[in-house]
């Protein structure tokens, strides 16, 4: 550990002690490193005696800085791991970081692009439009056509800081996993590793550019979602250049109402966008919190969502989509047996899971929820309760489902904030049923035939030759097999004869030795020994002949 890392570790431990995090663990369960730290750093007192545990943890993350704040924000979405009071407090974390100076941003952009800003852009504003822990955004115009753009640039020298903090977080996670018996359910090492992958992905803006291009292509011409254009020729790992958009923040209800927005349709559009991404495209924006969603000023009677910051996306394969759709339909029909069977069939829980017990556990958790009217039921919380129940039956963490459940909670929360009477089930059901209709039945068969038709059209002329070649190889392999079988039988026969001769030789040897000890039978003993030698010689020759 370097002196700088040791200093940072001391700072982390100091903050945890000052926020009273160690006191949240009962004394009898406290690991010895925690007790040692508290006794060794006796001058660091708990400054948060009167606060609940959620507030203490939130304040600790805020004091630890932007990397830990982002980690806390990620944890707030993992309601399958954290108690509700802690998750709700962590959801209040805000990524408030002072901007770095415009001159540093200019140098970073020019170093990445290999030319001066004035070569490519006009009206570059050194005062950032927005600032966050990893990057900040500046406005400008493209010199070639005057289009308004935003330039997102990674903070200078942020990568070594992130990597150092991640190493310390991994070390702390290993300590917690080793010394805190109750940490097994929280899986601290897995959670930190998941965060490490997420934040390192965010450092590569080319990845975000690719995600935005894919999402924009999926919704070309859509009345539901608009994704700003990315100017790839000016994008690098540390610089992202895209179209500047103007819109109303989706969380600004007053401004939306003042603009005459159709709030019911806007809320339903959010659900439409989510389920279209999941079931049509298998590619969804997985960071749809209010800060990343705007609403177009134009056509408020037919509102258009605008999505930005595509750094985090999720994907689902065909099987995951099928199981997910069937799960939704099954538990809204209260078919808990089918829900349990689907979890086993999908491989989400071990194949030896007792379906009867699993069904009963699901029924116990979900039946009280479905006593409410469907319009009051939270899709996200149904999934959350379902995953928590499945985890008791050793369900493995499914990263794509965790992202999906987090995004669904965002969409649902936004939708009900915009229009409290939103019936998510009625809005989503047509998408689920249509997708299932596309996947099973005559139409699905016809679609599969159409999808494979070009392949078979290409291969059909080759079919006679392939059949002939297959028959020829089969005939050749049959002859080869017959020869191998004949050789095997011959070898087995020789081996049997050799074993017989060796056995007779051994018997004659024993008889000869015995007769030699009897003076009246010396001649017979000599004959037996000679016979034994002859049998062994023949047996040895037979084993050598193959």
Swiss-Prot record:
Highest rank taxon of the organism: Bacteria
Lipid bilayer topology: Multi-pass membrane protein
Domain Protein kinase: 123-501
Binding residue positions for ATP: 129-137, 152
SUPFAM superfamilies: Protein kinase-like (PK-like) (SSF56112)
Keyword terms, alphabetized: ATP-binding, Cell inner membrane, Cell membrane, Kinase, Membrane, Nucleotide-binding, Transferase, Transmembrane, Transmembrane helix, Ubiquinone biosynthesis
Membrane spanning stretches: 498-517, 522-541
Xref: InterPro entries: ABC1_dom, Kinase-like_dom_sf, UbiB, UbiB_bact, UbiB_kinase
Recorded metabolic or biological pathway in which this protein acts: Cofactor biosynthesis; ubiquinone biosynthesis [regulation]
Active-site feature positions: 287
GO BP, sorted A to Z: regulation of ubiquinone biosynthetic process; ubiquinone biosynthetic process
Compartments, record wording: Cell inner membrane
Pfam entry (one): ABC1
Top-level class of the enzyme under EC nomenclature: transferase
Gene Ontology molecular functions: ATP binding; protein kinase activity
Enzyme Commission no: 2.7.-.-
Entry GO terms, CC: plasma membrane
Function: Is probably a protein kinase regulator of UbiI activity which is involved in aerobic coenzyme Q (ubiquinone) biosynthesis.
Similarity comment text for this entry: Belongs to the ABC1 family. UbiB subfamily.
The name this protein goes by in its record: Probable protein kinase UbiB
Organism: Aeromonas hydrophila subsp. hydrophila (strain ATCC 7966 / DSM 30187 / BCRC 13018 / CCUG 14551 / JCM 1027 / KCTC 2358 / NCIMB 9240 / NCTC 8049)
